[in-house]
A protein has these predicted regions:
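Helix-loop-helix hairpins and the membrane-proximal interhelical loops
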Residues: 1-49, 162-164, 195-278, 422-423
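Helix-loop-helix junctions within the multi-pass membrane cores of secondary transporters/permeases
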Residues: 2-36, 57, 78-136, 264-359
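Residue-level signature of catalytic and energy-coupling elements of molecular machines
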Residues: 19, 39, 123, 192, ...
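Hydrophobic/aromatic residues within the transmembrane alpha-helices of Major Facilitator Superfamily
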Residues: 23-30, 60-63, 67, 148, ...
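Membrane-interface helix caps of multi-pass small-molecule transporters
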Residues: 38, 63, 67, 88, ...
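Loop-to-helix transition at the N-terminal end of transmembrane alpha-helices
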Residues: 44-60
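Juxtamembrane transmembrane-helix boundary signature
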Residues: 58-79, 110
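Membrane-embedded alpha-helical modules
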Residues: 93-207, 320-431
Length: 431
């Protein structure tokens, strides 16, 4: 049956190799079951229900990817958009988390439509590489600021906006040690470096951080507080235009780039045999709106899947293994509930650091490419909004090409997106 489902021999792999690859991928991304409830919990969402939703959508998305597309790529709620969901849309802009889930649902529907009609590649090709790289860098800076704030390393200040926190406090010390441990373990190529760092700091918090242990295993909590709680009506109002656009664009670049990058590394992008890639695009589109129904922010393909590919994973059995392991995580809810913010902060900061390597992709000799990219990246943390970063980036890019006589270098898609953001600023208002 496994041979018929996954065509193991055709891909030069075995059941044992696929299971090991699945375990490897799971260990590298399991941190999300702690980080996602922590972030969305800050937006007022019930952490226990978010924990269940995270495990379920990671299992469902990965299973669809494995069984339908036969790809060794796992899925889970994405880093970056969960932070935008909680800290920008809910806490900064003042919308309810139910309305934010509605925006995720609408963006997921748009995502599914453009995938079904084959428009996904067309849109991707229309966005300049410099802005695509800048979006990743900007989200990295945004995550970095959130991580430093969560750890207490950076605190607010009336005179200078931000300043250094109390470096003698236990949370700060534990967060710094956790970050160093993650970097060292990652350098040593230890599977699950981020997960080990989170668990290590959490254990230390019981002794030095005043945390309390409430057990390790229990029956899964109820998902009822977040299940089908999305507010689509509010998400369709004019004030949500840029929120939906941000979710859609970031999902588009992040998921597509990850799918193609990991598939290429696995040797699965064979000219003339792109049916599996198309199925994988459809699978990850479906997972986005499914996640919003369960009660979590946008779901995406995980670049950590490359670790499983490196371990020999070539088929959907790898993704299915990840799905089963995420289902098993439903029974460790008590552990997830006691993970403090300063334990997940090192993981956030490490992911942020990795995202900054996209800076190397920029052509710094062409100011019409480099400057809009820099504006995109810098505006995200300094306005505390991924949407504003995208808006100023696209508008600056279009203006730079227009006033240097290089209009033809800008794809029509750039002008359309820049126009949408200009309309939003002048007729709907900023924020």
């Amino acid at each position: 049956m496994t041979e018929r489902l996954f065509k193991l021999q055709e891909h030069g792999t075995t059941v044992r190799t696929e299971l090991i690859a699945g375990l490897t991928t799971f260990l590298t991304m399991a941190y999300i079951i702690f980080v996602n409830p922590s972030i969305l919990g800050d937006a007022g969402m019930p952490k226990d229900a978010v924990f269940v939703a995270t495990c379920l959508i990671a299992a469902l998305g990965s299973a669809i990817m494995g069984l339908y597309a036969n790809y060794p790529i796992a899925m889970a709620p994405g880093m970056g958009l969960n932070a935008y969901f909680a800290y920008a849309v809910v806490l900064h802009m003042g919308f309810t988390w139910q309305a934010a889930l509605g925006a995720v649902f609408i963006s997921g529907c748009l995502f599914l439509v453009v995938t079904l009609f084959g428009l996904r590649g067309l849109i991707i090709q229309g966005i300049p590489q410099s802005l695509r790289s800048a979006i990743t860098v900007g989200i990295g800076l945004f995550l970095g600021l959130i991580a430093l704030k969560s750890a207490g390393i950076v605190v607010g200040d009336k005179a200078t906006l931000v300043t250094l926190g109390d470096l003698h406090s236990a949370p700060v010390i534990l967060a710094v040690l956790g970050f160093i441990a993650i970097v060292a373990l990652d350098k040593a190529r230890v599977p699950g470096a981020i997960l080990i760092g989170i668990v290590g700091v959490t254990i230390a918090s019981f002794f030095f951080g005043g945390n309390e242990f409430h057990g390790l295993f229990s029956a899964p909590p109820s998902i009822a507080p977040t299940f089908l709680q999305l507010d689509i009506h509010t998400a369709l109002t004019k004030g949500f235009l840029n929120v939906v656009l941000v979710f859609f664009l970031v999902e588009l670049f992040d998921a597509t780039g990850t799918l193609m990058g990991v598939a290429k590394r696995a040797g699965l992008l064979v000219p003339g045999k792109m049916e599996r890639l198309n199925k994988s695009l459809l699978a990850d589109s479906s997972a986005i709106f499914a996640g919003s129904l369960l009660g979590t922010s946008s779901t995406t393909a995980y670049v950590e899947s490359a670790a499983g590919v490196q371990a020999g994973g070539r088929t959907g059995m790898t993704a299915l293994t990840v799905a089963v392991l995420f289902l098993a995580c439903l029974f460790v809810a008590p552990l997830a509930g006691v993970v403090p913010a300063y334990a997940t902060a090192p993981a956030l900061f490490f992911v942020a650091c990795l995202m900054l390597r996209e800076l190397a992709e920029l052509d710094w000799n062409d100011s019409t490419e480099a400057v809009p990219a820099a504006v995109t990246a810098l505006m995200m943390p300094f306005t505390y909004s991924i949407a504003n970063g995208l808006a100023f980036g696209f508008i600056t890019y279009a203006a730079a090409k227009l006033f240097t006589g290089r209009v033809r270098e800008a794809h029509p898609m750039v002008w359309i997106i820049a126009g949408v953001f200009l309309f939003k600023f002048f007729y709907i208002g900023g924020h």
